[in-house]
């Protein structure tokens, strides 16, 4: 049995098996290169670590060169967390109505101090609710206008953040205006007011607003609905209180938290 292995032959790295030359490199190996077989002649290759991996080559001692593979825990952890966060945001965005998506985009474009966070919550209202309370000039700035149709509690993920709020309420009344008022618990007046209209048939009355948040304690909002100066308003029902087409109607209110960027 003759010599076999890798040898330097006329400044070229050659592969020998039993004194038979099997292949010849086109150029000498450089520092930290390896010989890699191909479909034709061997070629020089270098090991490269991708995200989350480390490669340490020790070749100062020609008699005991080593290659150590290990995991870069910090990089791998960040990579995994980033993918999880992206998946969460993608799932959240998929469930948001198109109108709210546009509201979020418009808000972020106009205020570059804001960025998306993962805090999103949606509430559905399917009960038929009769709203006998009215909104008038004398009570529009108080907590007495309209009828409360629901309370909604949100726990912020961040301090100094902001809630983007979107409400789509199915309302009916004998022809006239419908008023929606959003009240934050602890306030003495509504933090947002919106208006809709019904001509005796169901209509979607919407409220869009942004509300500042300062801490991480739970925040409770209530939504009040009523007629402007006169009239009974029905939520999720016809103007006479009957079901719409004999089915259950559902109104929604969504809260999306955004926060200030900390990376410029």
Curated annotation (Swiss-Prot):
Gene3D superfamilies, sorted: 2.60.120.1340, 6.10.250.2680, 6.20.30.10
Keyword Protein biosynthesis: no
Pfam assignment, any one: Pgp3_N
KW Nucleus (keyword) present: no
InterPro entries: Chlamydia_pGP3, PGP3-D_N, pGP3_C
Keyword tags: Plasmid
Domain of life, source organism: Bacteria
Name of this protein: Virulence plasmid protein pGP3-D
Organism: Chlamydia psittaci (Chlamydophila psittaci)
């Amino acid at each position: 049995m003759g010599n076999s292995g890798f040898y330097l032959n006329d400044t070229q790295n050659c592969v020998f098996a039993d004194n038979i030359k099997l292949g010849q490199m086109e150029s000498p190996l450089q520092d930290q290169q390896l010989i890699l077989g191909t479909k034709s002649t061997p070629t020089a290759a270098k090991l490269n670590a991708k995200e989350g991996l480390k490669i340490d080559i020790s070749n100062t001692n020609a008699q005991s060169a080593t290659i150590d593979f290990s995991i870069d825990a910090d990089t791998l952890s960040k990579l995994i967390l980033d993918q999880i966060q992206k998946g969460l945001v993608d799932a959240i965005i998929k469930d948001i109505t198109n109108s709210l998506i546009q509201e979020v985009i418009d808000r972020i474009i106009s205020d570059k101090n804001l960025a998306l966070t993962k805090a999103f919550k949606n509430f559905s209202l399917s009960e038929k609710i009769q709203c006998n309370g009215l909104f008038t000039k004398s009570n529009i700035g108080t907590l007495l206008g309209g009828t409360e149709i629901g309370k909604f509690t949100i726990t912020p993920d961040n301090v100094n953040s902001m809630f983007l709020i979107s409400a789509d309420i199915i309302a009916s009344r004998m022809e006239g205006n419908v008023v929606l008022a959003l009240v934050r618990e602890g306030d003495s007046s509504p933090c947002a007011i919106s208006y809709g209209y019904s001509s005796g048939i169901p209509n979607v009355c919407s409220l869009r607003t942004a509300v500042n948040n300062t801490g991480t304690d739970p925040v409770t909002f209530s939504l009040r609905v009523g007629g402007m100066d006169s009239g009974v308003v029905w939520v999720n029902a016809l103007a006479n209180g009957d079901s719409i087409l004999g089915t259950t109607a559902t109104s929604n209110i969504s809260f999306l938290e955004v926060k200030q960027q900390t990376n410029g």
